[in-house]
Structure formats: structure tokens, C-alpha cells
């Protein structure tokens, strides 16, 4: 088994696990994992591939939570519907942006997401939103040939397995949700710092 396959499946497993355990924030790890762990050379391909994989994993994990009654449906439907427009506009703008600069801005966004993770959240409305936004973004990138379909399949395979374990653990650690969110926020801040360190040079004059 090749390193690229192991890294793709392992990275997908980590993202799926976080989605199953926490509900949404884990999707932020997909792009940096594809870039720095799997070794995808083009930032736009990493974003498009990660968006596709995360959307599939998010919908898969969401189904289990919906069956258990953990979904705040009104919020989920409104948030997902309105967010599609933003996802399409944002991904169209992102495709026109320099890849390295886009990754730097992504690092800044991760800081914001990390801060939001510190706040208590209600029932799971994140997963259908993550899935819908991700699918809209992925289709937009795919239309420009910016999705690695084989890599996405490997990532999704790992994500399905990781999501199962994440959901099983979530039922046992439900009382510690806020603690888990804070720990994950610390991870998000760490990854964001690494991304900003690696990509800040994109804004330096040539």
C-alpha cells in the first residue's frame, strides 16, 4: 500500500472522526491535510477535492444524527439554503485568486472558526450546512477540472470509517461537548498558525 493512499485514507479518517465527534469544525482540516500531509501540489485542487470529500462525509454522518433526533431542522434548512449562494460566489472568486494567497486567507478564516468553536452550540445544524456548502463548492471547482476524483474517493473511504468512530465516541462524551470544542479550537489555532507561516510569503513582492 503506497504512502499516498495511506495518507489520504488516514487524513480522511481524521476529518470524518472530527465531523462525527463535533459536528462541523473538522471540515476545516481537509484542505491543510491534503496540502501538507497528502502532498497535493495545487491549492485549488486541494480545496476542490477536500470540499467534495467533506460534503459526502458530512451527509453520511448527518444521517445518523438525524435518526437520533440531534438535528435542529429549521436552522439547518435555512442556513443550508442561504449558504449555497455564498458558497458558489465564494468558490468562483477563489478559483480566480492566486492559490498561495488563497491558502493564507484560509488560515485567517481558520482563526475565526477556532474562535467560534469556543462558543457553546445548539443541536446539530452544522452537518447539512457543511455538506451543502461543500457540495456547491466542489461542483464549482469540478467544472474547472480542479477535483482529484481518485484522491477524493480515498479520502471519503477513510472519512466514513472515521465518522463511525467519531459518532460512537460522541454518544459517550456528550457531557463534555464544550471541553471537546475548546480542545479542537486549540488544534484549529495551531494548524492555522502553521498555514500562515507556510504561506505568508505569497504576499511579498517578487
What is the role of each PLM region?
Residues 1-18, 31-43, 63-128, 142-206:
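Juxtamembrane transmembrane-helix boundary motif
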Amino acid at each position: 500500500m503506497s504512502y499516498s493512499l495511506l495518507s489520504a485514507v488516514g487524513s480522511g479518517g481524521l476529518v470524518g472522526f472530527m465531523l462525527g465527534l463535533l459536528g462541523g469544525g473538522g471540515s476545516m482540516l481537509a484542505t491543510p491535510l491534503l496540502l501538507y500531509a497528502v502532498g497535493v501540489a495545487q491549492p485549488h485542487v486541494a480545496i476542490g477535492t477536500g470540499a467534495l470529500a467533506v460534503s459526502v462525509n458530512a451527509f453520511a454522518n448527518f444521517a445518523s444524527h438525524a435518526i437520533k433526533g440531534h438535528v435542529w431542522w429549521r436552522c439547518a434548512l435555512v442556513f443550508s439554503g442561504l449558504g449555497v449562494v455564498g458558497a458558489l460566489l465564494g468558490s468562483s472568486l477563489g478559483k480566480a485568486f492566486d492559490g498561495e494567497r488563497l491558502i493564507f486567507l484560509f488560515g485567517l478564516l481558520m482563526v475565526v472558526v477556532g474562535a467560534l468553536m469556543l462558543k457553546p452550540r445548539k443541536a446539530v445544524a452544522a452537518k447539512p450546512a457543511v455538506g451543502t456548502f461543500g457540495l456547491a463548492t466542489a461542483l464549482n471547482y469540478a467544472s474547472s477540472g480542479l477535483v482529484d476524483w481518485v484522491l477524493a474517493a480515498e479520502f471519503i473511504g477513510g472519512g466514513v470509517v472515521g465518522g463511525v468512530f467519531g459518532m460512537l465516541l460522541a454518544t459517550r462524551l456528550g457531557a463534555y461537548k464544550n471541553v471537546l470544542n475548546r480542545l479542537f479550537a486549540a488544534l484549529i489555532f495551531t494548524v492555522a498558525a502553521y498555514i500562515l507561516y507556510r504561506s505568508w510569503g505569497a504576499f511579498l513582492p517578487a
